Amino acid sequence: MKKIYIITGANGFLGNNIIRNLEQNSENEIRALVLPTGITKSLENLNCKIYYGDVTQKDTLTTIFENIKDKEVYVIHCAAAVYIKTAYNPSVYDVNVNGTKNIIDKVLETKSKLIYISSVHAITEKLNHELIT
């Protein structure tokens, strides 16, 4: 059975390197999700098809999930917003929580498998700045 890999955050450091690893097996079909405004230079000459979408906009995820019936589909969710400053940034929540929910919904809807890559913003800091273990 043909395997399809859908990589979110495909033009980021991790997503790009995952694609480089997956493309070593020429039987893999690799679908790279990139923001509509994303730079795709790092994906040039890689064995992947680029799809434009935004994990925070569920309707933009439809195309990348098309034509997957009777195929083994793995979604590797690398898309994330990282904001190092201490001030609250609502886009971090929107991408990392709402965007991940949209990906999970599509995975469940299509009976795909999910590999979730977390971010530094998955857990808030403790109030007294203790290390989280």
Enumerate the predicted regions with their spans.
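Conserved Rossmann-fold NAD(P)-dependent oxidoreductase catalytic core, especially the SDR/UDP-sugar
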Residues: 74-77, 98-133
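Active-site proximal helix/loop that lines the substrate pocket
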Residues: 10-12, 38, 80-84, 119-122
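Residues at the starts of beta-strands that form the adenosine-phosphate
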Residues: 3-4, 28-31, 112-114
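N-terminal Rossmann NAD(P)H-binding glycine-rich loop of SDR-like oxidoreductase domains
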Residues: 4-25
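Local beta-strand N-terminus motif with an aromatic residue
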Residues: 2, 69-73, 111
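Conserved glycine-rich Rossmann-like NAD(P)H-binding loop of the short-chain dehydrogenase/reductase
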Residues: 26-38
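NAD(P)H-binding glycine-rich loop region in Rossmannoid oxidoreductase-like domains
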Residues: 39-42, 48, 52-95, 106
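Short glycine-/acidic-enriched loop or helix-start segments at secondary-structure transitions
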Residues: 16-18, 42, 86-87, 125-127
